[in-house]
Amino acid sequence: MCMVSCSKNEILSLPNYSLQYSVEQVDFDTLFTETGSITRTIKLYNPHKGTLLIDAIELQQSSNSQYIMNINGVSGTIAKNVEIAANDSIYIFIQAFLNQNNVDTLVQYVDSLIISYNSKRESLPIVSWGQDVIKHKGETRESFTITAGKPHVILDSLVILKGHTLTIEAGARLYLHYNANLVIHGSLCVQGTYDNPVLFSSNRIEESYETLPGQWGSIIFRESSTANNFEYAIIRNAVNGLRVYGNAENPISISLTNTRIQNMSANCIFAENAHISASNCVLANANDYVLALQGGTHSFVHSTISNQGAIGGRNYVPSVAISNYSFVNEQECPLLQVVFSNSIIVGKIQNEIDVFTQNDTDILDVEFFNCLVKTTIESKYAHYFNSSIQFDEHENLFRNMYDLNFTLDTLSQAKDNGNFEVAQLVPDDFRGQSRIADTKPDIGAYEFFSE
């Protein structure tokens, strides 16, 4: 221990005077190679009544290191003769810049921060996992296939030409940069499976970005697009999940099966003049509409729509909006038919469904058949609702909707209330479990099973 006569400026050089560290190891999340990481911070604290002189702070692999540090505003792989005054501290900032590893799988990158002082060397491990990627920036492509090997990163846009098809195989991962879009003038064929879904997400893959919406643009379908299919896709954390620009003469066809679209800063699906057929789908949490259908023909069977809003706060508009005109320019969008059956539509506000007409005299072919809904328009538009159930918000519907777990609670209103004939059209739920085995199917994308 330091004696009473010790001065704050005295250099404490005996080995028993030690630093305190804010962490025992520096861990980075999985990182894309050749892309800088976020910064990790280490605090070195001197708890003593005199000054500690650090001979050197260095990265063990020196010039071969995949990391770089910054101390007192100076970047490099080594810093010498660093003083830490009594009861004071310094901060070390570390970033990773990983080289390509030339394999499809993750590779671990390990280094150590070596702190030499008072005739001793102390070590803090630095660990990260690097993933090589295939990058697309401003590309316009004819037909090609994305496989489950290296992830693909879209930095600006990837455009598929009219008459051509982008095929995405099971287990493939597409990561999009801020404001980047996947633009389809031709066709998109997504071939995921339950065990190996296709992922569309942000290229910020650190844990702190996992639920942040608005990190990339959208999957955009242009007028010439046709014959689009999604099977077991996960689309998350964008501005819009699907943005569909069809025309009345040739609506854009999109089939969605066993697909989740969630956590959007604007809309999960915003479609003009489209033909959307969806079954066993989950659309969850958007700050504007979850589902905006302007014109076209649509069918949603055994699907779950839930909206508690995403980070940033939702606007107080209904989750499901149906109209026979464009919300963008108010041009007519002929609405031929919209049918929801054995589906759930709930959310944070009192009215989660609304139907808008261009003229007060317009009558739209809209039906909510045997659905569980949260709405205030049922009395005004009774003809839209056929055998549907009003949601009782005092009951637990899902196991944990705040954790995006939309499997049914033990006492869920949706249990055993599905229409059997409708269930026969989609006999297995999102997980492949039979919903007709007990002849009492549940409403929504998931059949209840005790866990």
Could you tell me what each predicted segment is?
Residues 44-48:
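Asparagine-centered strand-capping/turn motif at beta-strand->loop junctions
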Residues 3-5:
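C-terminal motif of bacterial Sec signal peptides marking the signal peptidase cleavage site
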Residues 56-59, 107-109:
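Contiguous beta-strand segments of beta-sheet-rich domains
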